[in-house]
Amino acid sequence: MAMLPKFFLVLLCLGLCSCSQKTTTIEGEQMTIFYRIVLGTSLSAKEKASLSQQIDRCFHKIDSIYNNWNPYSELSIINRAPADVPITLSVELSEFLDQVDTLYKLSEGRFDPTVGPLKTLWLLHLKSQTLPPKDVWEQHYKDMGWQHLEFQSNTKTLIKKNPHVQIDLCGVVKGYAVDCLNEICNTFCPNNYVEWGGEIKTSGHHPSGRPWRIFSEAAGTILDIDDMAIATSGNHIQKWCVEGKIYTHILDTRTGKPLELSSYPIQSVSVVHPSCAYADAIATVLMTFDSKIEAKQWAEEHHILTYINDGASS
């Protein structure tokens, strides 16, 4: 679950608040990714210890179920399973894959959580300033695809129709974790802010009484984010020049190749939505459109609030 660079500046300004504005801040690192939680109240030592324990349990659940980098996670066990054998899923993973299936269908396959091995292959070569052999990446491309999985939400089972297909939920699980953490925080204080790896969700308002404010580079301005989540995808940092072309870390599932800047002009996308998991996935989906106009039209058709920066058009 490697951290992707995000383009947010959170304007909490807590250090400038008056002494009457009590807050509780908990921050740390989980799975190599920094997290920060701010509550608009001063918790007692007992309450803070309880909150910290629940936060740890949330991250443990994420690691033990959804983390494909953990060889003992439920997801890793599924990835090692043979084809054509029904796999019984936990309630948590089954419900999550139901959301994933919805996102896959909504995006018409642009969001596909089986792209992981192909992406790893491309990044390994791009970081070495080379391109993978065509026959190698094309074989990886044939092995990926949500269509190679038979998921039954009613029976909570999954069957791999292709033994090589792998599930990688990195493109959505950070947002899901933020949703879970936000639910926990709401039981302690209705005004809170949660961030993990650049994915953000807020409830209520800032301790000063104003809205929570976040600067989004995709929007080019400060946004008021109350009782909503915001996620951003962008190509500013993770890109490589190979054989005269600039490639990014995002793959187009329609071609099996990473986005090449001359063909994909969108630089960053922010999505605002009640679900951080949803915003997380859709932000990446919108990066794969051929133009800002097309991406904006698709988002509007699906009633999704987005901010898209292509460095040119308004």
UniProtKB/Swiss-Prot annotation:
Flavin transferase that catalyzes the transfer of the FMN moiety of FAD and its covalent binding to the hydroxyl group of a threonine residue in a target flavoprotein such as NqrB and NqrC, two subunits of the NQR complex. It catalyses: L-threonyl-[protein] + FAD = FMN-L-threonyl-[protein] + AMP + H(+). Residues 1-18 form the signal peptide. It is a lipid-anchor. Keywords: Cell inner membrane, Cell membrane, FAD, Flavoprotein, Lipoprotein, Magnesium, Membrane, Metal-binding, Palmitate, Signal, Transferase. This is FAD:protein FMN transferase. InterPro entries: ApbE, ApbE-like_sf. It is found in: Cell inner membrane. A lipid is attached at residue 19 (S-diacylglycerol cysteine). Belongs to the ApbE family. FAD binds at residues 31, 69, 110-112, 168, 174, 251. Mg(2+) binds at residues 171, 280, 284. A lipid is attached at residue 19 (N-palmitoyl cysteine). PANTHER family: FAD:PROTEIN FMN TRANSFERASE, THIAMINE BIOSYNTHESIS LIPOPROTEIN APBE. GO terms for cellular component: plasma membrane. The gene is apbE. Its EC number is 2.7.1.180.
